[in-house]
Amino acid sequence: KKQRRVAYAASFASFIKQASSHEDEFLPWLKLFDSVSVREQDGVEYVKSKGINCELTLDPTILLDKEDYEPICAERKIKDKYVLMFGWNTNTDLVEAAKMVSARLGLPVYNIVPPPRKMFCGIPRRLDVGPCEFLSMIKNAEFVVTNSFHGTAFSTTFEKPFVSVVTGKADTRMYSLLDQLGLSDHLVTKDQINIDKMLVTDFSCVRERKSALRKTSLNFLQNSLKGL
């Protein structure tokens, strides 16, 4: 019996341009799927250009509200107010942006990005951060400075003031997510950061947009799994 194959919220991340040089390897397998959705708009367009139906859906972590995550957040370990720096890599722009926010708010910065040592560029790094601590660090931050998709996603989930710092080639998932949520102005270079504007983000509008996007994403899943 043929098994149903569903790809939910897959992603090309920042590698959409490289996909064309590997089509012989992955397209035959992709065509075996009954339903396909991805997280970025240019990914939707690319997959559709290959004759495969594709929809734009939310990352699965965004299908939940902050109330769903709060029970698994670790106990707060940093009692004072702080700025959080988190990214998928460490670069000068991210560090400078974090220090800029720190100076503006008069708060210390804590770092949970590589490399794994206690201090990096004068910023202390938390070495005791697993998934539950990660959620807690974002939830309790006064401001989040990130260049990571999931740093961005969870900042919107916990409705924190944040900035997603772009350096060269950005993750297209971040572009698509923030565009859908009406937060494109949070994706900037370090020289474009408007801290005062980020501090007064209207998350009520973001909640409304998320609610509609969740319905679309859940409809995709329900339709894809119908009859099983």
Give the ranges of each region predicted by the language model.
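Active-site anion-handling motifs in enzyme catalytic cores
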Residues: 1-228
